[in-house]
């Protein structure tokens, strides 16, 4: 627009067409924290926000930074665990290198398990080192998938939460990115190099869903039985039934129980 070349961020955002933009991209250069906060405060219909080569102050924070449907933050050194926990119904989130630790990611996954709402569909975080599943999934029920290469892992939301449309989370590390995919048990999933017409039977993750629910029931039953000398016979029979169901799923599925 004429006359806007040397305008301040406030001058730009004072123009109604920019305040109503659904898509905003910051390309190269750097931006001050106050200016970035101003954009987030004034952009009322923002659905797609991108930092593309733009340097962001390490102390930047804003409550709306992760309440946007689609996000690409190439400079993500400012991102904290608390930011990730504010995601709700995002579809696509991509972050560059962060200062997040394994402990942060583990807390993030535990929060996802117990979240009342779906947080995201796809989340990508740049991380060069391969993941250590024993640390990343510490104290979380998980399955290790053999159907994919490189290794992939599954966790599930708590069964007491009924409003989650996508209760399954697939986690993997490929091409220097830590990737999280949330979806329903009936989602049909194909790799890029897989032929969706190669089989008449559609592949879903129903078996993985069922196996994780059984693991959850077993964990709750074991906790109930802890420290009891004379175990309830009904509980013991129930545990045996769950073992049989789980073994059947393990025999037919391409996954193992994560340890």
What are these regions, as identified by a protein language model?
Residues 1-259:
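Non-core capping and flanking segments associated with repeat-based/extracellular domains
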């Amino acid at each position: 627009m004429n006359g806007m070349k040397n305008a301040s961020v406030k001058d730009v955002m004072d123009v109604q067409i920019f305040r109503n933009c659904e898509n905003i991209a910051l390309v190269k250069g750097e931006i001050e924290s106050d200016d970035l906060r101003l954009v987030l405060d004034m952009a009322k219909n923002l659905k797609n926000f991108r930092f593309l080569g733009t340097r962001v102050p390490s102390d930047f924070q804003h409550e709306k930074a992760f309440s946007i449907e689609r996000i690409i933050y190439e400079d993500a050194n400012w991102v904290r665990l608390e930011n990730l926990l504010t995601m709700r119904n995002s579809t696509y989130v991509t972050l560059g290198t962060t200062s997040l630790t394994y402990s942060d990611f583990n807390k993030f996954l535990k929060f996802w398990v117990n979240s009342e709402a779906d947080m995201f569909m796809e989340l990508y975080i740049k991380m060069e080192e391969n993941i250590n599943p024993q640390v990343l999934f510490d104290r979380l029920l998980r399955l290790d998938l053999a159907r994919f290469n490189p290794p992939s892992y599954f966790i599930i939301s708590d069964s007491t939460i009924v409003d989650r449309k996508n209760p399954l989370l697939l986690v993997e590390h490929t091409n220097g990115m830590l990737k999280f995919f949330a979806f329903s048990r009936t989602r049909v999933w194909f790799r890029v190099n897989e032929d969706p017409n190669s089989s008449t039977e559609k592949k879903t993750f129903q078996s993985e869903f069922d196996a994780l629910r059984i693991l959850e029931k077993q964990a709750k039953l074991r906790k109930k039985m802890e420290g009891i000398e004379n175990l309830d016979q009904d509980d013991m029979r129930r545990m045996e039934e769950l073992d049989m169901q789980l073994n059947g799923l393990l025999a037919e599925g391409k996954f193992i129980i994560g340890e």
